[in-house]
Amino acid sequence: MGKTKSRGRRAEKKNKKNEPGFNEDVSNLDSDVTITNQEPLSSSMSSTSGIPNTFFGLVDNNELDYFKQAESTLNINAFETDEERQGFINSVLEEAQGKELKLVTNQICSKLMERLILFANHNQLKKIFKQFQNHFVSLAFHKYASHVLETLLVRSAALIEKELTQTDEEKLEEAEEEEAEEEEAEEDSLNNDVPMEDLFISMLNEFKPHLTTMIDHSYASHVLRLLILILAGKELPSSVTSNSTLRSKKSKIARKMIEIKDNEDFDRAFQTPQSFKNELREYCQTIIVGLDTKSARELSIHKIGSPVLQLLIQVEGLVDRERSFWHLIFAKDSEGKDSVEESFVEYLLSESVGSHFLESIIKNDGARPKYIERLYKLYMKDRVLKLAKRSTTGVYIIQALLFKLKPVEVEYILDQIIPELAELISIAENQNLDLANKLIDASISRGNYRRDEIINQLFIKFAPNYDIENPSDNTSTEFIENILQLTGSTLGNTRDDWPTAEERKRALFLEKLMEYDYKFVICTWFNFMALPIERFVQMCFHGVFCHVVEKALIVEPEEPKPIQILRKRLLNIFQGQIVGLACNSYGSHIVDSLWNFTVLLPMYKDRIASELLGDSNKVKESTYGRLVWKNWGMELFVRKKYDWKALIKQQEQEYYGETEDSTEKRAKKPIELKMERLAEEKRRQEEMAERAQSGYTKRKLEEATGTASEKKQKLRGRRR
């Protein structure tokens, strides 16, 4: 019988798996990685003249398996001591010696090289740096090697600072420790004597012929931005935080997925030698020679090149008093309106990349205030409201201007926007919440400028049916619904959905409103009471909305009686839910906040404590419950009730400001004044009774001794 023919891709794939030399790990890499494990250099490099397109070799299967296992070992960090980890790193570096260049251009091995650089000591760092010499340009333009190079640059900046600030004694001690730890070849020891500053400058010289090409390259532009930050002595941003100015959004997400964490060298600035300022000046001059006004303006709206130009404008003041990059893009401050410049500024105000560029150069301290004021007065002042209506572009420029212009101009912008604030905010499309945030901050900075109008506009937008002066019991949930968008959110989901960034943004906005004015807190209370209890409890267990509930549990000083009654009604919602909240990671913070929220309400404090005591076993078995038990002083409640009552009394005294250090006295309540009058009257009556008793006793004594009749005779004699 003839042999049947296998059909389909699965059978073909199975046969391919059975072939000798097939590596399944390599075949499962993403489409950017070829079967040879080597990522080819980007197409822009190969097509651009002057950029070396160097091939560093392939990583064979045996090497790949070893380095992949080493990367996994470093990732889980299952070492008992730092010495054990350092010994493992030393062995991996010995195995990788001479192979560094082909490792950094491999997708898997490049992650290993990053980890090795993060953990390497200073001598090992210099060795790796020297292996990259004469190839830095090729690595900067490579998809994977560029990330390794960025990590190496940050560690190098830290080492340069250490060499600058290190005393001779510290250098001698470090040299002795290194000699005791390991015996190196004489050649290596001589090479390690070269200062890191000199090695860094030699690398900078490699990049100088290629700076203009690096500006708009997908990978090399990030390396260039990092070099500029180091030379300028600016803070080197983290590579994983969401607001990092260095990495792209995709890159930051990828680094979180592969679990590469920065060390202490990130998120800080380093001291730099004087030679770095000269190098920064040369870099700026080299870049600006290849630019004219047209190309610079095109670069400012380029998706990749724009962040580089923003950074150059920010740091150029350190080495160039003329601000050449600024005046290459915009006219001088003494010149008037120009039609070409006006068209360019209009494009910046209406395009996403351009508006981000303009917002960045306004926010950063690189541009002089008079430059920004000129652009504002010539091209933006007469249409502030129109720009604020551009919810994806122009409004961000207006927000940036609120904190950079003179006070008179800031108040002018506020006068234009505040009356139209309700119309500018869109609930459905979630637009201009940031504008409301910035208006509140700007108003506070100007001494609460037009505060009441801002509050009214926000209530008109988010709670049009709410009566601010006389809130009623039939208040709906429109306020928190319009802001938090509870319907359609992850609230109440049983699939362990993570709260979205949109929900976090809305929750922070509501918290900001409650901090701004207590009227928003009262409105939030009414909305909480209008919610079904199950829905409110779901908010307490939600990772984002629980913070809204916690922030709403605040008590105003000298609280009037109607507000105190409202506070009691809100506390009734928590009845029967305390134990469940106390045993939850989010709800436990709310129960902790209830301690301060129940000030002047000892009965409610006692009720909550009794509820915790009623199910004490469940509370004490929970990690979060034990913290609540401690914060509420439940041991005193159980064993020393009098001391627990003393804590409540102490809290009330602190609320009234009746402490030993306090100098101001609060206004006393009518009942307290009445009690003081009664006490004073009682004291006066007791004094009168005491005087009467003493007089009676004295007369009796005088009658008994006979002195009273003598006095009468004398008195009669005087009267005659």
Curated annotation (Swiss-Prot):
Top-rank taxon, per record: Eukaryota
Keyword Repeat: yes
Regions of compositional bias (Basic residues) in chain numbering: 1-16
Compartment(s) of residence: Nucleus, Nucleolus
Pfam families in alphabetical order: PUF_NOP9 (PF22493)
Pumilio repeats: 95-130, 131-166, 206-242, 290-331, 339-377, 379-415, 530-567, 572-610
Signal peptide: none
A single MF term (Gene Ontology): RNA binding
Protein name per UniProt: Nucleolar protein 9
Record's compositionally biased regions (Acidic residues): 170-190
Chain spans, region Disordered: 1-31, 165-190, 658-720
Organism name: Candida albicans (strain SC5314 / ATCC MYA-2876)
Composition skew (Basic and acidic residues), residue ranges: 662-690
SUPFAM superfamilies: ARM repeat
Gene: NOP9
Keywords: Nucleus, Repeat, Ribosome biogenesis, rRNA processing
Gene3D superfamilies xrefs: Leucine-rich Repeat Variant (1.25.10.10)
GO biological process: endonucleolytic cleavage in 5'-ETS of tricistronic rRNA transcript (SSU-rRNA, 5.8S rRNA, LSU-rRNA); endonucleolytic cleavage in ITS1 to separate SSU-rRNA from 5.8S rRNA and LSU-rRNA from tricistronic rRNA transcript (SSU-rRNA, 5.8S rRNA, LSU-rRNA); endonucleolytic cleavage to generate mature 5'-end of SSU-rRNA from (SSU-rRNA, 5.8S rRNA, LSU-rRNA); ribosomal small subunit export from nucleus
InterPro entries in UniProt: ARM-like (IPR011989), ARM-type_fold (IPR016024), NOP9 (IPR040000), Pumilio_RNA-bd_rpt (IPR001313)
Protein purpose: RNA-binding nucleolar protein required for pre-rRNA processing. Involved in production of 18S rRNA and assembly of small ribosomal subunit.
Broad class of the protein's primary localization: nucleus
Family: Belongs to the NOP9 family.
GO cellular component, as recorded: 90S preribosome; nucleolus; preribosome, small subunit precursor; small-subunit processome
